Design a protein with these regions (language model features):
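Key DNA-contacting residues within the recognition helix of helix-turn-helix
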Residues: 6, 31-32, 59
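Residues within the alpha-helical elements of helix-turn-helix
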Residues: 11, 22, 50
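DNA major-groove recognition helix of helix-turn-helix
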Residues: 9, 34-35, 43, 62
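A short, Lys/Arg-rich alpha-helix, primarily the initiator
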Residues: 1-13
C-alpha cells in the first residue's frame, strides 16, 4: 500500500524482520500492516525516524 515505505526499506537494505523488530512487531504483523496500511501513529513516527524521511513522503498514496 505504501510504496515509499518499501522503497526506503530496500534502500536501507533491511529485511521485513529487521523493520518489524524496530517496530516491536512480528514479521507477519509488519507484513500485514504493509498490506492494510494500518500503522499506529507511534509506528509511523518510528518508520520516519528509521528512514530519515518525512511523513508526507513515506506514507504518500499517490504515484
Amino acid at each position: 500500500m505504501y510504496k515509499n515505505v518499501k522503497a526506503e526499506q530496500a534502500r536501507a537494505g533491511m529485511t521485513n524482520q529487521q523493520v518489524a523488530n524496530v517496530l516491536g512487531l512480528s514479521r507477519r504483523g509488519y507484513e500485514n500492516k504493509l498490506k492494510t496500511g494500518h500503522f499506529t501513529i507511534n509506528e509511523c513516527r518510528k518508520l520516519c525516524e528509521m528512514f530519515s524521511c518525512g511523513f508526507d513522503y513515506l506514507f504518500s498514496t499517490t504515484e
